[in-house]
């Protein structure tokens, strides 16, 4: 019995030390799984192309011109003082033949460039924060949603991480009905996000 409790104490100590470490690592970004079975062959998977970055992983859809989903880990070690990038970026790392959404594609649409993996979750370095400003991490969001309940949930998840928890998050758009903004970026009928603590 004494050995059992000692082992549990060591595991608890190890886990509490690990959760404070940054989770900027491609291998850690898909602990919630690959919900659409996205794969890395760009020819066979134009609507479900898997991209794994150090900051987040996602299944990209070249038809809707946005992610099907984005997954990332969040701990207190992922939040620093680099601040928010002042710019959005065209994602030139998408496969050849995929449309690269421009920051100006959302101009005049009435929709925000809504982050899936949010800026505030990747502020240890400026480079980490810049990556979440790739347009391939955006979906059109109504300003009331993006700046309201969506932003509040992002803040809540960071609060959970700040108190020592590891938060596994996956989010995405859904309910497409054929409406688009400039350059054919699809407008989702709803947005969704799941956080596992």
Model-found features: residue ranges?
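Bacterial N-terminal signal peptides that target proteins for export
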Residues: 1-8
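Domain-level detector for secreted/extracellular nuclease and nuclease-toxin modules, and
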Residues: 4, 14-197
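Short N-terminal leader segment in a subset of presequences, especially plant chloroplast
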Residues: 9-13
């Amino acid at each position: 019995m004494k050995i059992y409790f000692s082992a549990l104490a060591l595991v608890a100590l190890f886990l509490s030390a690990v959760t404070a470490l940054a989770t900027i690592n491609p291998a850690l970004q898909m602990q919630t799984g690959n919900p659409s079975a996205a794969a890395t062959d760009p020819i066979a998977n134009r609507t479900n192309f898997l991209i794994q970055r150090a900051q987040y992983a996602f299944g990209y859809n070249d038809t809707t011109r946005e992610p099907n989903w984005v997954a990332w880990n969040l701990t207190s070690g992922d939040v620093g003082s680099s601040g928010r990038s002042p710019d959005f970026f065209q994602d030139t790392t998408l496969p050849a033949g995929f449309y690269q959404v421009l920051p100006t594609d959302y101009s005049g649409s009435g929709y925000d460039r809504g982050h899936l993996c949010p800026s505030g979750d990747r502020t240890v370095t400026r480079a980490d924060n810049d990556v979440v400003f790739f347009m391939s991490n955006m979906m059109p969001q109504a300003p009331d949603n993006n700046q309201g309940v969506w932003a509040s949930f992002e803040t809540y998840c960071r609060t959970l991480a700040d108190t020592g928890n590891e938060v596994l998050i996956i989010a995405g758009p859904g309910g497409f009905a054929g409406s688009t903004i400039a350059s054919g970026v699809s407008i989702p009928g709803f947005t969704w996000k799941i956080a596992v603590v």
